[in-house]
Amino acid sequence: MASKGGRDKIKLESTAGTGHFYTTTKNKRTMPEKMEIMKFDPVARKHVAYKETKIK
C-alpha cells in the first residue's frame, strides 16, 4: 500500500494580472521554496511568469 502523500496541491497564478491560473502538485520536502515558472497565459496570449499561491 502506498504511503500517504508528500505532495500538496498548489495554484500557479499569472503575474500578468489576467486572473488565469494552473493547478499542479509539488513535493514540499524536496522543494520547500515557492515555485515560479514561465508558462503560457492564453488571456495575455504570451508566456509569462506564474507564481505559486495557496488553493483556497
UniProtKB/Swiss-Prot annotation:
Compositionally biased intervals (Polar residues): 15-25
Any single Pfam family the record assigns to this protein: Ribosomal_L33
InterPro entries per record: Ribosomal_bL33, Ribosomal_bL33_CS, Ribosomal_bL33_sf, Ribosomal_zn-bd
Molecular function via GO: structural constituent of ribosome
Annotated Gene Ontology cellular component terms: cytosolic large ribosomal subunit
Annotated stretches, region: Disordered: 1-28
Any single GO BP term: translation
Keywords linked to the UniProt accession: Ribonucleoprotein, Ribosomal protein
Keyword Signal appears in the UniProt entry: no
Keyword match Ribosomal protein: yes
PROSITE patterns, per database record: RIBOSOMAL_L33
Cysteine-cysteine disulfides: none
Biased composition (Basic and acidic residues): 1-12
NCBIfam families: PRK00595.1 (NF001860), rpmG_bact (TIGR01023)
Family indicated by similarity: Belongs to the bacterial ribosomal protein bL33 family.
PANTHER family, A to Z: 54S RIBOSOMAL PROTEIN L39, MITOCHONDRIAL (PTHR15238), LARGE RIBOSOMAL SUBUNIT PROTEIN BL33M (PTHR15238:SF1)
Protein known as: Large ribosomal subunit protein bL33
